[in-house]
């Protein structure tokens, strides 16, 4: 049984959670993407608003491309959205083709204008409208009061980062980082999920290591697993088998392990009693503009600028950051630096490991704010249900806000 990578992470608030269930129905989790207005200045690509339900973003885009007879790479998008949800996001296509008449179940497309091609990351964030069912709503005010006093919610990466139904991405990432390609292949190919199609074939591969049998038994939709198996049969090298995968897939594994370490850093900081909304000497802070953290604009906190920086944090113009470990990330000093070193040491990896990765897997790293400060946060209770509405910057998980509020057992 795979361990939940979020299970042992500390909560920032000590107030009991409201409990409850999310995503009982797709309509319980509504996501609306926000992109910069500048996208619509100039540019000749057609921009559509894609509404989907029970579709992964990539699967929906591939289906749209198939229906109009083009390669899916011709359709641009800014961010991936949850599958078990109702989501609204923008897509671009740089040719004169009308998508509004494309008929796909649970997918609608509306033309909104002309603009520049969309690329991954080219969004400001997302509005969320989320229903949590069967809660104890009277506990909510205390949690929100305490979260406000402590500056917000812990900015943990959500379970989506590690694999929602089969949380192996971070384990594979660590093994790749250590150059243990055979073990990484065993985890990626062999670890079963939670009652997923293909689980029996995975288990059999883990027991037998029989590549030919796996190619017979692995379902066709496990295309990356099958591609690796074919490459191994051809080369006898698990390293070359991984490197045959598309770079975005390889990056998922490394990003997942970076995210796992970042989560451990936040949890350790809470555990040791250090604030997330107040800088310590040696911290690195990120600038904030109009509520959006600018993760590439950072500066170091020293004894001499400590009061000035904490004033900026109180005014909402800066936030304390944590490490996204990589070959050129900016390391903290002082107590925060000690915590970073301990996280790496306890995980059994070093910055050298990041530098030695094959080029397609190499990640520079960076900094990420420790807190989530939802904008326009509102809620209302409807019987035992609570309906939440808020905006989050890109790369921030609504499920991490809800985790602190619900405190799942």
Swiss-Prot record:
<keyword id="KW-0819">tRNA processing</keyword>
<dbReference type="GO" id="GO:0003723">
    <property type="term" value="F:RNA binding"/>
</dbReference>
<dbReference type="InterPro" id="IPR001656">
    <property type="entry name" value="PsdUridine_synth_TruD"/>
</dbReference>
<dbReference type="InterPro" id="IPR011760">
    <property type="entry name" value="PsdUridine_synth_TruD_insert"/>
</dbReference>
<comment type="function">
    <text>Could be responsible for synthesis of pseudouridine from uracil-13 in transfer RNAs.</text>
</comment>
<feature type="domain" description="TRUD">
    <location>
        <begin position="152"/>
        <end position="373"/>
    </location>
</feature>
<dbReference type="GO" id="GO:0160150">
    <property type="term" value="F:tRNA pseudouridine(13) synthase activity"/>
</dbReference>
<dbReference type="InterPro" id="IPR020103">
    <property type="entry name" value="PsdUridine_synth_cat_dom_sf"/>
</dbReference>
<dbReference type="GO" id="GO:0031119">
    <property type="term" value="P:tRNA pseudouridine synthesis"/>
</dbReference>
<dbReference type="InterPro" id="IPR042214">
    <property type="entry name" value="TruD_catalytic"/>
</dbReference>
<comment type="similarity">
    <text>Belongs to the pseudouridine synthase TruD family.</text>
</comment>
<keyword id="KW-0413">Isomerase</keyword>
<dbReference type="InterPro" id="IPR020119">
    <property type="entry name" value="PsdUridine_synth_TruD_CS"/>
</dbReference>
<feature type="active site" description="Nucleophile">
    <location>
        <position position="82"/>
    </location>
</feature>
<dbReference type="Pfam" id="PF01142">
    <property type="entry name" value="TruD"/>
</dbReference>
<protein>
    <recommendedName>
        <fullName>Probable tRNA pseudouridine synthase D</fullName>
        <ecNumber>5.4.99.27</ecNumber>
    </recommendedName>
</protein>
């Amino acid at each position: 049984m795979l361990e939940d990578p979020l299970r042992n992470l500390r909560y920032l608030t000590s107030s009991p959670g409201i409990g409850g269930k999310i995503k009982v129905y797709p309509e319980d989790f509504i996501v609306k993407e926000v992109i910069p207005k500048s996208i619509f200045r100039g540019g000749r690509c057609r921009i559509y608003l894609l509404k989907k339900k029970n579709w992964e973003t990539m699967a929906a885009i591939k289906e749209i491309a198939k229906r109009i007879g083009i390669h899916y790479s011709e359709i641009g998008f800014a961010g991936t959205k949850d599958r078990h949800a109702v989501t609204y996001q923008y897509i671009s296509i740089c040719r004169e083709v009308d998508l509004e008449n494309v008929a796909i179940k649970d997918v609608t497309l509306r033309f909104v204008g002309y603009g520049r091609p969309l690329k991954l990351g080219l969004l400001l964030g997302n509005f969320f409208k989320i229903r949590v069912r069967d809660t104890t709503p009277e506990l909510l005010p205390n949690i929100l009061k305490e979260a406000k006093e402590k500056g917000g919610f812990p900015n943990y990466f959500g379970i989506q980062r590690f694999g929602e139904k089969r949380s192996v991405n971070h384990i594979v990432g660590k093994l790749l980082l250590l150059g243990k390609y055979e073990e990484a292949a065993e985890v990626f190919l062999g670890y079963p999920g939670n009652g997923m199609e293909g689980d029996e074939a995975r288990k059999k591969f883990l027991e037998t290591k029989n590549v030919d049998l796996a190619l017979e038994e692995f379902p066709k939709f496990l295309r990356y697993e099958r591609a690796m198996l074919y490459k191994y049969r051809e080369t006898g090298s698990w390293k070359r088998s991984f490197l045959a995968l598309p770079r975005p897939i390889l990056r998922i594994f490394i990003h997942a392990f970076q995210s796992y370490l970042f989560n451990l850093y936040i949890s350790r900081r809470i555990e040791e009693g250090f604030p997330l909304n107040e800088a310590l000497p040696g911290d690195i802070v990120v600038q904030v503009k109009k509520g959006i953290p600018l993760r590439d604009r950072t500066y170091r906190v020293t004894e001499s600028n400590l009061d000035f920086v904490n004033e900026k944090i109180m005014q909402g113009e800066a936030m304390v950051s944590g490490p996204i470990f990589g070959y050129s990330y900016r390391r903290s000093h002082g107590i925060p630096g000690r915590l970073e070193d301990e996280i790496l040491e306890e995980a059994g990896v070093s910055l050298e490991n990041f530098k030695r990765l094959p080029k397609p897997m190499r990640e520079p790293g960076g900094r990420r704010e420790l807190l989530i400060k939802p904008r326009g946060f509102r809620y209302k209770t409807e019987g035992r249900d609570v309906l939440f509405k808020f905006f989050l910057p890109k790369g921030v998980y609504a499920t991490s806000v809800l985790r602190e509020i619900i405190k799942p057992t």
